[in-house]
Structures are given as structure tokens and as C-alpha cells.
Design a protein with these regions (language model features):
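Glycine-rich phosphate/nucleotide-binding loop
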Residues: 134-228
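Buried hydrophobic positions in well-ordered alpha/beta secondary-structure cores of metabolic enzymes
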Residues: 9-10, 72, 144
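Non-catalytic terminal and connector segments of soluble metabolic enzymes
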Residues: 5, 23-41
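Glycine-rich phosphate/diphosphate-binding loop of Rossmann-like nucleotide-binding domains
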Residues: 34-38, 45-125
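Glycine-rich oxoanion-binding loops at beta->alpha junctions
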Residues: 125-134
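Short acidic, glycine/serine/threonine-rich loops at helix termini
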Residues: 17-23, 94-99, 134-137, 154-158
Length: 229
């Protein structure tokens, strides 16, 4: 099965990794400015607006990207599956290219030999090429994506090759900590209906998968074959 993965940040508004958006009211100049601790600035023109518009600023850190890369490589080794990683570095020559470079540097320095010994491969391609390949694939690999890409593509993969209810969601930290959850989240809409006394019907398969995945991992950690099988 194909397993898209996600990193932090990018266009998502989280407590630590926040994107910033501005509704432009009218004509004016938009700039991207970085101010170093010593006061020096790096300034780039985004756009000279002649009318109203919209601006979005996104960011990530090398530390976060490195942690994501380690988590992906370790998960691939743990599951003995090939790892694909895809961005659009031909267009995003700094932002996406930084992801590509960090993944490759970490792979070459720390994981190439381990992957070879495990009989699996690391493969990088452009996101549009990856989508075309995935739709024709039989599965059996991990597809690592940036945050937004993974959010969208995971639903596409689950719908094209089964259903959303059959999708699993596993949070993996670089230190090897695993957390299993139902991919659909808390189904808030159904819960509010339940509070009103209305009848609800929720597919429980994703919750079952979360429990069985966690039990299997616990079995691996405790070396209990009957549980980890």
C-alpha cells in the first residue's frame, strides 16, 4: 500500500509553524524581508500591485525538514518499503529544492547503506510525475510529501485504491515514537448530532486499524510474534 507522509509547516497554521496571509486592499508594493539579529536585511520584491489582491507567506526550518526526513527514512526501514519523495523543485528553486537537498544529504550520509542492506530504495521525483506514477502503481512503497501535498494526496490515494475508511494514520517521530489514530479524525459532525439525540452511523474500520496498528507495533517492541504478525 502507498503511504503519503507529511512534514510540518508550509501553508498550515499551527501553533509553531504559522503561515501569514494578507488581503491586499489596493495598489502598493509587497516585499519579502528577512532581518538578521545583527540588523542586516535581505529584501525581495514579491509584486507591485495595481489593484486589490492576496499575499501568503510560508516558511519552514532546516531542523524541521531534517526531522521529517529522518522519520521517513526510519519508517521505510521499519516497514521494509521503498521511499519516494516528491516536490516541485524545478519551479520552487529555493523552498522545495531545500527539501530535496536535505533529504538527499541525510540519505547519503546515514541511510544509503541501511537501505541497500534492507533491499529497498530511496527515489526522488517531481510531484506531478509522482502522481502519474502512483495512479498506475500497485503500491508497496512510502510516498513522502510536503504538508499540503500529503494532506491532499492521501485522500486521493485512499479513494482511488479503496476508501477513506480504509486509510491508516501513523505519526512517526525522528526518535522512533509512533502514534496511531483514525485517519478521519474525531468525526466532529457526527458527535454533535449524537449530542442532539440524532442517530448517527460512522464507519469504525479506521478506528479498528488504529488499534491493530498500535498493538502490532507494541508486539514488535516486546518481541511478541503472536501480536506483531
Amino acid at each position: 500500500d502507498v503511504a503519503p507522509s507529511r512534514g510540518l509547516g508550509d501553508v498550515y497554521k499551527r501553533q509553531v509553524y504559522k503561515n501569514t496571509e494578507i488581503k491586499v486592499p489596493g495598489p502598493g508594493k509587497a516585499e519579502l524581508v528577512f532581518t538578521a539579529e545583527d540588523g542586516t536585511e535581505i529584501r525581495e520584491l514579491i509584486h507591485n500591485f495595481t489593484g486589490s489582491g492576496i499575499i501568503q507567506g510560508i516558511h519552514n526550518t532546516d531542523k524541521s525538514i531534517s526531522s521529517f526526513a529522518h522519520a521517513c527514512f526510519k519508517y521505510a526501514l521499519d516497514t521494509k518499503q521503498d521511499l519516494w519523495f516528491a516536490t516541485k523543485d524545478t519551479i520552487s528553486k529555493k523552498y522545495d529544492h531545500n527539501f530535496k537537498d536535505i533529504f538527499q544529504e541525510i540519505y547519503d550520509a546515514e541511510y544509503a547503506e541501511q537501505f541497500k542492506a534492507a533491499g529497498i530504495e530511496y527515489f526522488y521525483t517531481l510531484i506531478d510525475d509522482a502522481v502519474a506514477r502512483v495512479m498506475k502503481a500497485k503500491g508497496g512503497f512510502i510516498w513522502a510529501c510536503k504538508n499540503y501535498d500529503g494532506d491532499v494526496m492521501s485522500d486521493m490515494v485512499s479513494s482511488a485504491f479503496g476508501s477513506l475508511a480504509m486509510m491508516t494514520s501513523v505519526l512517526v517521530s525522528p526518535s522512533g515514537v509512533y502514534e496511531y489514530e483514525a485517519a478521519h479524525g474525531t468525526v466532529q459532525r457526527h458527535y454533535y448530532k449524537y449530542l442532539k439525540g440524532e442517530e448517527t452511523s460512522t464507519n469504525s474500520v479506521a478506528t479498528i486499524f488504529a488499534w491493530t496498528g498500535a498493538l502490532r507495533k507494541r508486539g514488535e517492541m516486546d518481541k511478541l510474534e503472536a501480536v506483531s504478525y
